[in-house]
Amino acid sequence: MVSVKIISQEDDMITVLFKDSDRALLNAVRRNLMGHIPKMAIDTVRFQMGTYDQCVKCEHLNPAGVARRTAGGTGCSKCEAAFEKEDEDYIVWETNYAIPDEMIAQRLAMIPVPTDIEAYSFEESCPDCKDLVDEDRGCPTCNMIYTLRAFGAKGGRTITARDLTFLGDDSGNVPEAYRDIPITTLHEGQMIELWATARMGYGVNHAKWSTTAGVTFEPRQIASISNDKRAKILFDMGLRISKKDFKDGKLEDVHKVSDLKKDLSLIHI
């Protein structure tokens, strides 16, 4: 009977030992880990396009030219401040940046967002959406909405996953470990505004829904000392593994065996 033992476990990595198994079973486990575990991921992105005059006083965005005194405007639509001089009364922002929208959408899709399989459903099985056509599906029970509004700066400003805002409680925010993932760079006069919708999916359909990366397996190997004199020569070369790691002439620790193999391969080179 197959037995499973956890060798090591960290926040983002786990090593498992399978006994009495074969490659076919392990490959099936690998494929299921990568492609058949439900995960939330950004699937659609709506970009807001246009040019805006931002009020220096209240920071409100007005449609370009509408509020300017030279165009017959009456000022900011929020605080009614007069728009007479650019950079003094208002700042012009345009949704124009170097990276295409399609590439930004792809980057957003690959940013890990929290997955709560108990709080969210697949759109296909959502109680409120399952009977609707695909175009009409999407509700708070099966979708997570993120917004992004960011402005450039002189010399350039990198926009990251930290700038994404989840429309809900803090549990939906991008995890701290991934908040520095870059999305694009904005320069003076450039801005970006978008709404991103995340939904549940499987990695078999797209990599953005894959819950794991780099799932591999290899036969377990055990290192043994057959010649103490020759082994001493190796240990004197500053390997990460020493003789004290061997018990009864054998090294069974999976990670230490891997380190020994890497060290020996470098010596061979």
Protein language model regions, located:
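Protein-protein interaction/assembly regions in multi-subunit complexes
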Residues: 1-59, 68, 72, 76-266
